[in-house]
Every structure is written in structure tokens, then in C-alpha cells.
UniProtKB/Swiss-Prot annotation:
Modified sites of kind N6-biotinyllysine: 123
GO cellular component terms attached to this protein's record: acetyl-CoA carboxylase complex; chloroplast
Gene from which the chain derives: accB
Pfam families: Biotin_lipoyl (PF00364)
Keyword annotations from UniProtKB, A to Z: Biotin, Chloroplast, Fatty acid biosynthesis, Fatty acid metabolism, Lipid biosynthesis, Lipid metabolism, Plastid
Entry protein name: Biotin carboxyl carrier protein of acetyl-CoA carboxylase
Amino acid sequence: MQITIKKLQDLLSSVQRKKIQTLKLKQGKFELLLNKTYKKVNQEIIPSQKSAVLQNSPSTIIKSINNTKKIFCVNEDRTEYATIVSPMVGTFYHSPAPGEKIFVQVGDEVKFNQTVCIIEAMKLMNEIEAEIEGKIIEILVKDGDIVDCGQALMKVET
């Protein structure tokens, strides 16, 4: 199979449309490496629908800012909330050290850039900051739990 300009244009169009970040293509002497970072995705809040269920949330939109994802949802009771998700794999901690005051608990109001937890990854303590203001309505992980990249940590009512 030979790569033509038309096939290459179609491929690049698909990469752009599907927001693919990394693509490596090699065929014979031809090699293409594409790295692209998407900073923002349009945000939209979709009203709840009784027939659809996704993790107890009928509507879900993912927004990426500064490599931290937030999932905006609308509950069945039409409460809008954002879900703070882990930007990395590691161990989740509610407080800066054992025995110290926890960063946030259910019912607390959080401000933009306020530290909400720590994720330890490769012996480094990474402070996770809220990128939205609101009230913590649920903490989805326990202190000391291992979390994956993209895993939901907390729900914040907006």
C-alpha cells in the first residue's frame, strides 16, 4: 500500500477531528510522527434524561484544562456538579501528613486553586488543586487508596 497525498490529508483530517494526540506511521522509507496537545475542549452541560445512566449521572462532558480533567454532570435531581479526577496514578491522601488536618471534607466550600488532596507518585507528593469553586458533595476514594489517571476523586457542586 502506497501513501498518497489524499490518504495523508484524510488521515490528518481524522486526527484533527478525533483529537488524537500522538500518531506514529511508518511505511518503508516514509515515517510520520505527530504530537499534538489539546488545551481546551468546549464545555456544555446537558440536561438529565431518565433513560440514560452513566455512573449514576445521565450526562457527562469531559473538559481538559492544564492537563487536569473535570467531568461536568447533571444529577437526576438536576444538581450540577464537577468531578475532580486524578491527573496521575498514585496513592491518594486526604491530609498533608498522618494525623494532620484533612484538606477538605464533604460540605466544605472550595476555592479555585485550593489544595484538595495529595497524590503520591514515585515518592513525590503532588498537591491536587481545585480548578473550580463550589461545595464538596462527595469524596469518592478513601485515604491511602491507589488511584488511576483519570479516576474520579471528588464531586463538587457548582
